[in-house]
Amino acid sequence: MALGKNKRISKGGKRGKRGKAQETMARKEWYDVVAPANFEKRQFAKTICNKTQGTRIAADVLRGRVFEANLADLNQSAGEEEAYRKVRFTVQEVQGRNLLTQFHSMEVTTDKMASLLRKWCTTMETTVEVKTADGYTMRLFVVAFTKPQANQQSRNCYAKQRLVKWLRMRITKMIKRRLSKVQIKEAVSLLTRNVLSDALVRRCNPILPLRELRIRKVRVVRTPKFDAQALLSAHGTIPASVEADQREVEEAVEAAPAAEKAAE
């Protein structure tokens, strides 16, 4: 009977030749996420990434990451009144241990939208797509709710269809006129500080009395070619991270004993 190799039996290897297990966190670095200059709190988050090793560059891995923050945390002077809005940023450039971000989207929380719904009124929604002066295409979702007129006897406050169409047309024209003349930095300030929504309420109230008008969602659907100078001008002076300096000192102190042992 011929004997052959039995594939079911694993070949025994040399024992004791396993490499020393390296700690996972030793291969990683911490980075600070920096918001543009039109927000009060600049460094609002931290993230972790593997160190540059061979052809795998850390900066390439970090670009494109999206981070979410609460608007009340970014603009602390506004207080808890702005806690119902979430702002997202996308990383565009890596500068040392700082990640320079740009506006990605903004959205109203689900519980806030649920609290605005009422019976006996008309809910109007419209979508507006506008291109800023520096080439960013933004899509805005606006929602409005009617309210009873003064001295009204009827229980409901439903709006006629022709007035709803007129309201949508005015909202669309005003948003395009205001945002098409400014850059992305000024457009974000108009949206986050309620300047645009307040102007829409003043212009739409003569047509229909509105109980609420909210820009419930904003998305950047198309971006221009990356411009490093424009990104740096949007960020202005980038605050230094004291913790990052401490981390570099700790890494240098840990590397010194290892170098002394190698010399011996």
UniProtKB/Swiss-Prot annotation:
Record Pfam families: Ribosomal_S3Ae (PF01015)
UniProt KW keywords: Cytoplasm, Nucleus, Ribonucleoprotein, Ribosomal protein
Subcellular location: Cytoplasm; Nucleus
UniProt-recorded Gene Ontology molecular function terms: structural constituent of ribosome
Biased amino acid composition, Basic residues: 1-19
GO cellular component: a single term: nucleoplasm
Major subcellular location class: cytoplasm
Region of interest (Disordered), ranges: 1-23
GO terms (BP aspect): translation
Homology family: Belongs to the eukaryotic ribosomal protein eS1 family.
Quaternary structure and partners: Component of the small ribosomal subunit. Mature ribosomes consist of a small (40S) and a large (60S) subunit. The 40S subunit contains about 33 different proteins and 1 molecule of RNA (18S). The 60S subunit contains about 49 different proteins and 3 molecules of RNA (25S, 5.8S and 5S).
Descriptive protein name: Small ribosomal subunit protein eS1
Source organism (scientific name): Leishmania major
Organism lineage string: Eukaryota, Discoba, Euglenozoa, Kinetoplastea, Metakinetoplastina
